[in-house]
Amino acid sequence: MPEAAVVKIPPDFPLEKAALLGCGVITGVGAVVNAAKVKMGSSVAVFGCGGIGLNAVQGARMVGALKIIAVDIAPQKLEYAQQMGATHLVNAAQADPIAAIKDLTGGRGVDYAFEAISLTKTIEQAYAATRKMGTCVVIGVTRADVQVQINANEMVYAEKTLMGSLYGSSRPKIDILNLIEMHQSGKLLLDELLTRTYPLEEINTAYAALERGEVARSLVLT
């Protein structure tokens, strides 16, 4: 492994928790803090409540967003989102998420929307749920052939911002240490993220549980 890819952490910080920081946490929290720069008192919608989306939810909580709307089709994932700080839950299998978000925001849409699923439909929904002069951030990495259709006039007249965020637009050597301090001060939730641990011989069971949406995050230990 290249030296540039290694971050030195405090020797007493549990490796199980450190493993969570290196992808989902830094990507989700970073998209909120570094990329969108969500302001205190804002309204936020997060489409997709997997490992990255859950951390976008808690990133929004950490910066003081007042209304945090979590969108998913899996009830268990929505429950995890509530634990991370979501104030409202929308099951997209039962309701139109755009209409639900507009209803929750007095018809305006949210100040910031985050898409963490990597689907054309949900990227377009997140953009549509963003208010005038709001910001929509795509966090999920799609297939190379995925295309998104956005009405150009709407982008101009509504002055919306559509942007991407890779790895939370982060500086890992700085941000991972900051995240450790945030956890130690009680601001960043990690214990609540780690739903289960598995021995290496049960790795297929771990993947199956992840695909079914039964876990927020899980670790395979060797």
Task: Give residue spans per PLM region.
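C-terminal hydrophobic helical "lid"/dimerization subdomain
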Residues: 124-128, 169, 173-222
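Residue-level signal for nonpolar/aromatic packing positions in well-ordered secondary structure
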Residues: 9, 28, 60, 81, ...
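Short strand-turn motif at the edge of the Rossmann-like AdoMet-binding core
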Residues: 2, 117, 140-143, 166-168, ...
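Rossmann-like dinucleotide-binding domain for NAD(H)/NADP(H)
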Residues: 155, 162-163, 178-183
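Structural detector of well-ordered beta-strand residues that form the stable sheet scaffold
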Residues: 7, 45, 69, 135-137, ...
